[in-house]
């Protein structure tokens, strides 16, 4: 059936211009769904622009920006050539779908709104000289687009990238740069990991102490956590957090690029920054320190105390108010139960709820399920959906929770079988703090492992034994960038690129369009974009 639809689509493409199709691929990442390239080119230097106002204010702003870049880079005033860009509204297209038709003297772009317009512009920009990204004059370059027809849409609706800003903080300009890189690759979800044992990075009006105390650790571990107990002796984190005005600015910046921002408040584990601020939230009463090392701490929130649950609800209420995203991520990963096993408050709550050990889980796992379910219900009252790492499957999963599957694909598949939505982000393929080369002595520091571009690119979220119903619950794919060993933006970009390019084709392309050799050829063009934008990137695939 899919083959029939594709053949029909290609037939329609062939009818859109005179002549025969000469290519069915373009030098674009991610590769568009359906492409037909014909003989002939259109010089678009100095082209005029016309746009349908129904596309919306943000889409029109994006079109104006593109026009300005083209005028500046091609060194011709708008309207000095015969070519014209025409942006039209087509409500029959899905929100992220678009079409491009280059024929005669026109480039006709159709979309139903902002995201389709953004993706069409990005596709066009990648086919023009790289100076289009900076507006730098490039008078000697050829500003030609081939006669072509593109019909494009993403495979997955959720195309995410995560950033941990707790272990190491990245300022506003660096976060915006991260969003810019995402936009080039047509990613649409920024997962912002704002709290962890090593620092609380989000201003809370209800609890201002969380960034006064919880943002600052006394010192930081030198080297790998399992091999070293040496510390640098330097306090880290004073003033390193985002104000709520900062957050609003980032959300607006992301929205202009078609990106949704999902906040993560990791609970009930990974909470030493909060425990150091409010020791009464813990099982032992402390004292606690904002952690200066990496790994998993035994000290977690005392969820047997109602006061702890009220604290969590107050925090999440403020987060839900601040972030317009339909989702809030509550973590739920790596929460040791050792403190709960001996805590009178937690044991009393277990008894009250009637939890008991069984052949699959201990009672304490069900206690965490109680926390997740309560937070899910609370967030639902605020109009939000809950996401958690795949540990939330242990015990009783909250009724409407979305599972982020990081320990492999099994958690996502289990969630889908249970009728829950899932997002695939397995460490085996999508943890970008892993090394990109086996020659680790000559690589920037990583957490370990080996994850070159080829392995990233090879990831497929579906398995042959999945039913169509189960597949429908897989919302998409995300890569994660944990920053224990990534203290600078230069290091961050190196770990991110070019692996994000590989990620984008997993997220966007149908399996039949995912061809590694074609991808490598297209990466030469992408490297020119990286270079002109000044990005620091790993060059292994270009040296092979």
Residue ranges and their predicted role:
Residues 274-280, 284, 289-401, 406-418:
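Active-site neighborhood of glycoside hydrolase catalytic domains
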Residues 385-401, 406-544:
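Flexible, acidic glycine-rich loops studded with aromatic residues
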Residues 93-299, 303-309, 314-327, 374, ...:
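Feature activates predominantly on carbohydrate-active enzymes
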Residues 45-51, 159-164, 233, 295-301, ...:
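Glycine- and acidic
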Residues 17-157, 380-393, 397, 524-534, ...:
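Acidic, contiguous N-terminal accessory segments
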Residues 63-75, 186-187, 381-383, 418-422, ...:
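Structural alpha-beta junctions
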